[in-house]
């Protein structure tokens, strides 16, 4: 019997209640997620031959169960985790939380009860991951991200940097075209990977398993990323803990930065101390040839690092605040140089308040080196109005996500939403990329007709605004409206009768019949395909070609 996500989420989230009080959310996530990891790998790999994760004697969740009610439960849990970490080269990854910390977990009986209750929650038979569905199922990974999303919400603005909303991650994955990747040699990199949620979503978009690289400077967050990769059945992914700007880890043998096929990133906004630990004027990797960013704002430092980390055929997407689009000074010079090189393929303006670490509106800058030489314009999308409220944050809906991706990938121009802006127009605007300068999505003013209010009647211009309908049903207009006086019409039928008049009109009936014929033809042609839709992740059988 497969696990239900709702039951899994409820059971795991209940464990957080055992830890509240002694620490804030940014700390108790370390405990809950480590236990989730230990329970999962114990259920999944214990007793297996050649497992991805080795479960050593005295290093499984079963040993934790035997500690319930014992005075030394905290110390015992630490030792179990240490054995598991040592057997799998996971030191510094899964042993970041101290289960014997009296300041966070209480003293004596309080710690004993709290940890015993916590283990009991994970001991629930309903959380038997050995009975999980097929190999590679993301049920556990989804639960992991569910927890991280809630931790980010509770942690507040200063602690939510480790998570990129899944919808935004999917947009980035799709607009860089990683779905076209067919080889396991394809590489993807995130220099500020956080918990790796963005990196995972991007890698999952590929048709095959690709090579995944990440770097994260925060120790606890880097540990989250490594565990997240394992829980998503991606144990070969390599996450390095260090500062990507001052100490980039991924390099070629000759010392140059390693170049990747795809790069995605959601770096911290407007980092003030970005140059700590190295001298940008004498950068060993040539990242700042287009200019050195301001000392107290690192937005362009990350962008330049990303560009340097892309192959000559590389694609990328990075989330940055809107300020990078229009700020002047040295940032303006860097922006001009990057635009002239043709590296920017497009810009997607996102709704405000999407991210847990900040309420600042952000954009996705889409990068493309492969087609840079022939670039004649930058495709801009103003998606700032498409979202739903989700608690105290905003969130992209499925229709918002699909609209952004469809419009961007097909380069479809849409009034007040998207257009291709020529490089000549951008140059004429002094390389200012502020989206409202090129796409006006302000609401049209509601013009009131005073004469209609005073004398009655419906302005003919309002009726003419429905011209798309009158083209299909030309005589229906005459059936509904009569001239009242020059420029104004009046209804020939009462409001209650409008629907019946429309439905009984010959032109509407003929249109409806044609529509149904087309639908029936489509249904007949696609029935074999639709009949194959089920819960299986296997590729659907296509209908036989005629």
Predicted regions mapped to residue ranges:
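Non-catalytic, mostly N-terminal accessory regions of nucleic-acid modification and defense proteins
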Residues: 1-180, 244-249, 349-352, 375-376, ...
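Conserved Class I SAM-dependent methyltransferase catalytic core
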Residues: 7, 11-14, 18, 27-37, ...
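Conserved NTP-handling cores and scaffolds of large molecular machines
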Residues: 23, 39-45, 147, 151, ...
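Short, well-ordered loop/turn and helix-capping segments at boundaries between secondary-structure elements
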Residues: 37, 231, 269, 312, ...
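Hydrophobic alpha-helical scaffolding
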Residues: 108, 133, 214-218, 262, ...
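Short helix/loop capping segments that flank catalytic or ligand/cofactor-binding pockets
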Residues: 130, 201, 272, 389-390, ...
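Conserved S-adenosyl-L-methionine
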Residues: 158-265, 270-291, 300-301, 320-323, ...
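Conserved P-loop NTPase
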Residues: 363-364, 368-405
């Amino acid at each position: 019997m497969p696990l239900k996500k709702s039951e899994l989420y409820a059971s795991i989230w209940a464990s957080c209640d055992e830890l509240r009080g002694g620490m804030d959310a940014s700390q108790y996530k370390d405990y809950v997620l480590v236990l989730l990891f230990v329970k999962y790998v114990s259920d999944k790999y214990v007793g297996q031959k050649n497992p991805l994760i080795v479960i050593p004697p005295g290093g499984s969740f079963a040993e934790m169960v035997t500690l319930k009610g014992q005075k030394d439960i905290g110390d015992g849990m630490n030792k179990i985790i240490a054995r598991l970490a040592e057997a799998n080269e996971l030191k510094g990854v899964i042993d970041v939380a101290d289960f014997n910390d009296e300041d966070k977990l209480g003293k004596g009986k309080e710690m004993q009860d709290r940890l015993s209750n916590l283990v009991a929650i994970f001991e629930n038979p309903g959380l038997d991951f050995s009975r999980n569905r097929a190999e590679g199922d993301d049920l556990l990974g989804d639960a992991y991200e569910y927890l991280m999303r809630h931790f980010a919400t509770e942690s507040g603005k200063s602690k939510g940097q480790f998570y990129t909303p899944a919808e935004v991650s999917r947009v980035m994955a799709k607009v860089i075209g990683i779905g076209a990747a067919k080889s396991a040699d394809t590489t993807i990199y995130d220099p500020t990977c956080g918990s790796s949620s963005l990196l995972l979503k991007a890698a999952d978009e590929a048709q095959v398993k690709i090579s995944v690289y990440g770097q994260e400077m925060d120790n606890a967050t880097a540990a989250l990323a490594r565990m997240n990769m394992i829980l998503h059945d991606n144990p070969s992914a390599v996450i390095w803990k260090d500062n990507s700007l001052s100490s980039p880890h991924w390099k070629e043998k000759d010392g140059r930065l390693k170049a990747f096929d795809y790069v995605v990133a959601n770096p911290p906004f407007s980092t003030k101390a970005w140059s700590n630990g190295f001298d940008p004027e004498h950068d060993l990797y040539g990242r700042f040839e287009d200019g050195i960013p301001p000392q107290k704002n690192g937005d362009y430092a990350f962008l330049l690092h990303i560009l340097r980390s892309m192959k000559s055929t590389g694609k990328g997407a990075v989330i940055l605040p809107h300020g990078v689009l229009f700020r002047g000074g040295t940032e303006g010079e860097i922006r001009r140089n990057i635009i002239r090189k043709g590296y920017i393929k497009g810009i997607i303006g996102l709704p405000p308040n999407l991210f847990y670490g900040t309420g600042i509106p952000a954009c996705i800058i889409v990068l493309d080196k492969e087609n840079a030489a022939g670039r004649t314009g930058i495709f801009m999308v103003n998606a700032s109005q498409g979202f739903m409220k989700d608690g105290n944050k905003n969130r992209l809906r499925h229709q918002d996500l699909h609209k952004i991706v469809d419009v961007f990938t097909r380069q479809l121009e849409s009034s007040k939403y998207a257009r291709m802006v020529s490089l000549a127009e951008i140059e004429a605007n002094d390389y200012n990329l502020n989206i409202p300068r090129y796409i006006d999505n302000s609401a049209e003013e509601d013009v009131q007709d005073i004469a209609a209010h005073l004398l009655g009647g419906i302005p003919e211009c309002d009726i003419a605004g429905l011209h798309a309908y009158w083209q299909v049903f030309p005589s229906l207009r005459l059936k509904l409206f009569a001239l009242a006086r020059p420029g104004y019409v009046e209804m020939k039928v009462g409001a209650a009768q409008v629907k019946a008049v429309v439905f009984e009109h010959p032109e509407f009936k003929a249109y409806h019949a044609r529509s149904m014929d087309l639908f029936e033809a489509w249904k007949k042609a696609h029935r074999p395909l639709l009949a194959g839709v089920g819960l299986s992740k296997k590729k659907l059988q296509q209908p036989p070609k005629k």
